[in-house]
């Protein structure tokens, strides 16, 4: 029995390490978030994820494919949760926006991730010839703005926003506030500072919807 047990241990030690896709994406996310797409090399990704280059290629095809998978992971882990704050029927429009901004401010200043917004950080570091990656990020930004517009349209239909208010322009304005919060966080702004920005925006709400 002892011999059989020893053989089992030896066999288990010899098994190849299983590739953990989610863990690899989270590690790659931190690199792209901190340094940007173009400044992050495949060698950096191999070192951070602990996976061999052929494994990453087999799973994601190339660096661009890995980035797209990371972007999807970011949206699932962070952006979608922020946007969920908007669509709680029990909240007033101001309360929903306050919770949305608070979730974003906490994310942008979290000690667990690099400062700022993953998407905005990457956009600001791309070169003019970045091509498909730039288009992918631009498309996602447009989705964020459309989500805000959808939220505002719903609240307008409920009578919380006057019918004459242009919710398209209002969504653009709110999206610009978020971009400014990201840049401020990247420059070292604290959670309290970002909450002040959000608070000022909400205090202006009656004027914004006139």
From Swiss-Prot:
Binding to the promoter region of BhsA/ComC is released in the presence of copper. One of its GO terms (molecular function) is DNA binding. Residues 41-60 bind DNA. Keywords: Copper, DNA-binding, Repressor, Transcription, Transcription regulation. Residues 18-78 form the HTH tetR-type domain. GO terms for biological process: negative regulation of DNA-templated transcription; regulation of DNA-templated transcription; response to copper ion. InterPro entries: Homeodomain-like_sf, HTH_TetR, Tet_transcr_reg_TetR-rel_C_sf, TetR_C. The keyword DNA-binding applies. Disruption phenotype: Deletion mutants contain lower cytoplasmic copper levels compared to the wild-type strain when exposed to copper. Represses expression of BhsA/ComC by binding to its promoter region in the absence of copper. This is HTH-type transcriptional repressor ComR. It comes from Escherichia coli (strain K12). The gene is comR.
């Amino acid at each position: 029995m002892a011999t059989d047990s020893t053989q089992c241990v030896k066999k288990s030690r010899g098994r190849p390490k299983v590739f953990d896709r989610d863990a690899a994406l989270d590690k790659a996310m931190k690199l792209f978030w901190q340094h940007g797409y173009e400044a992050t090399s495949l060698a950096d990704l191999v070192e951070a994820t602990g996976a061999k280059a052929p494994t990453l290629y087999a799973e994601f095809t190339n660096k661009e494919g890995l980035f797209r998978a990371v972007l999807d992971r970011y949206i699932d882990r962070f952006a979608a949760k922020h946007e969920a704050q908007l669509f709680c029927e029990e909240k007033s429009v101001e309360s929903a926006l306050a919770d949305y901004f608070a979730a974003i401010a906490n994310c942008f200043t979290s000690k667990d991730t690099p400062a700022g917004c993953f998407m905005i950080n990457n956009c600001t570091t791309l070169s003019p010839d970045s091509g498909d990656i730039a288009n992918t990020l631009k498309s996602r930004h447009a989705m964020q703005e459309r989500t805000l517009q959808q939220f505002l349209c719903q609240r307008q239909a409920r009578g919380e926003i006057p019918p004459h208010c242009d919710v398209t322009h209002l969504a653009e304005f709110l999206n610009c506030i978020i971009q400014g919060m990201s840049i401020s966080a990247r420059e070292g702004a604290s959670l309290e500072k970002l909450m002040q920005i959000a608070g000022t925006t909400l205090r202006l709400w009656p004027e914004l919807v006139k």
